[in-house]
Amino acid sequence: MERKNNYEIQAAQARALFCARDLDAVAREHGLRQEGQWLHLRLLGEPYRVSRRNGRIEREEDGRWLPADGFDETLTIFDLLCDAKPGRHAVGTWRTTLDFGGQVHRGLLENEKPDALELLYDKDPARLRAACEMLGGEALPGADVSYALPFFEDLRIAVQFWHGDEEFSPRLRFLWDAAADQYLRYETMYYALGLLRTRLQALG
């Protein structure tokens, strides 16, 4: 419960900081469509909108706007909108998340045992393919399943999956465009990956 409350507090602080910004300038910087109280953007190929009044976030699903105020979504979106560097642009080459942070959080990304998603996709890789394609992904060479997904603006993120065998466990890996740190902070990349995993699981 304490951990959940800490997440809620941090998300509430992020919303308050966002609402204190010059949101017209934020909209201009990112080319966001404005509609009344709402600022519209696309994240992982999906339509989102953020309230100028209170920072609440919604995602469009089947023609309806649904609350999307999860911790990972909240921190990721506000970092992208408020802390992206001017003049940013993707470069089209790939790096691991650890490449951006000097191996600081290696233990968070390298598990000895396969997790639930890896086991799921090992049995049914079509679920991963379907989810990636629903998010606007384009197939890439390499790995047993490999896609580049639109993330934000021109930034993309790659999803790679290898089946397990007698020697190796199934493996799901994510790669960022090498310029990802122009769009979001290293720490926020972990929240973004949490969001991506949630959306893959929901769609596949």
Q: Residue ranges of each PLM-predicted region?
A:
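Short Lys/Arg-enriched alpha/beta "domain-start" segment
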Residues: 1-39, 43, 82-135
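Generic alpha-helical structural element
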Residues: 66, 117-120, 148, 185
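Ampiphathic alpha-helical segments that act as solvent-exposed interaction surfaces
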Residues: 66-91, 177-204
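Domain-length accessory/inserted modules outside core catalytic folds
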Residues: 104-113, 117, 141-143, 181-184, ...
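Charge-rich alpha-helical segments
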Residues: 1-12, 16, 36, 54, ...
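Amphipathic, interaction-prone secondary-structure segments
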Residues: 27-53, 138-163
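Intrinsically disordered, low-complexity regulatory segments enriched in Ser/Thr/Pro
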Residues: 46-75, 162-187
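Conserved binding-pocket/active-site segment within a compact domain
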Residues: 122-182
